[in-house]
Amino acid sequence: DDEKNSEIPFINRGTIVLATVAGDVHDIGKGIVASTLKSAGFRVIDLGNEVPVEKILEEAKRYNADIIGTSALLTSTMSEQKKLEKLLAETGEKASFITMVGGAPCTQRWAKKIGADAYSEDAIDAVRVAITLIEEKAKKSGKGDKK
């Protein structure tokens, strides 16, 4: 099996740190998103659920993430996504990461309101959006696909 797998070229589209925000125990949707992103060639660092924004930023820096994706399944925890955007701005790290938000109560309007770079409706959309954002970032920086 290992021999067969070694013939399959690995596409490294980039690194994504995923987390369900502090105060939110929901994990299933984020797990599905993680699986679909991995299948599409992303390196996914899944931090789990109830993750404070400071920890999300710390891990994103540690893994040199291209994208930070946060999930909020409760309207009461959506403010954590906003808190992350504020932290990124305050620390001067906003330009270092692409941010994506998702979760049942989230919308494109919410993403725009809090300053997130993108919103994804579901796991399939997350892959499409992530690929598009990585390609746009590569064009801006003059770099091609990561190898």
Language-model segments: residues:
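Non-catalytic terminal/interface segments that mediate subunit docking, oligomerization
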Residues: D1-G48
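Compositionally biased, intrinsically disordered low-complexity regions
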Residues: I16, D117, G144-K147
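Cofactor-cradling patches in redox/metallo enzymes
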Residues: K30-A40, V44-D117, D122-I131, E136
